[in-house]
């Protein structure tokens, strides 16, 4: 299984806006792309004056081919969603990982970018 963690640095007061975008514009199509929503968290667990919060969105897909299929299915609606999130947040990163004890498949494409 591939775990995906979106790390979004955002002002605490903008978190409801990001979650509304997620609910209205990303979640309706996530299953068709092979994504399963796994959780949403905020850190720190309090709003600190003048400091951003981190919104963590977690997902999973079945395996590496499913991850690349999900990426290939990115369409204009997905791009527009992330552009809208970027307009609200300070920074955003996506982490893609698998179980450390699982054997890693060999990369078969020479010019592949993960």
Region annotations inferred by a language model:
Residues 14-15, 45-47, 81-83:
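Intrinsically disordered, low-complexity segments enriched in polar/charged residues with Gly/Pro
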Residues 97-114:
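Acidic/histidine-enriched, glycine/proline-rich intrinsically disordered or flexible terminal extensions
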Residues 5-7, 96-99:
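Short amphipathic
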Residues 2-9, 38-75, 109-113:
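Short, well-ordered beta-strand segments in beta-rich or mixed alpha/beta enzyme
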Residues 21-38, 50-51, 60-97:
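An amphipathic, aromatic/His-enriched active-site/gating alpha helix that lines ligand/cofactor pockets
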Residues 14, 64-67, 102:
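Residue-level signal for secondary-structure boundary sites
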């Amino acid at each position: 299984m591939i775990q995906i963690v979106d790390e979004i640095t955002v002002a605490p007061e903008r978190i409801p806006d990001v979650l509304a975008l997620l609910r209205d514009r990303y979640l309706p199509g996530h299953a068709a792309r092979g994504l399963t929503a796994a959780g949403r968290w905020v850190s720190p667990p309090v709003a600190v004056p003048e400091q951003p919060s981190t919104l963590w969105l977690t997902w999973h897909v079945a395996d590496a081919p499913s991850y690349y299929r999900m990426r290939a299915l990115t369409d204009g609606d997905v791009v527009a969603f992330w552009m809208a999130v970027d307009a609200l947040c300070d920074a955003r990163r996506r982490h893609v990982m698998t179980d450390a004890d699982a054997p890693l498949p060999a990369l078969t494409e020479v010019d592949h970018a993960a």
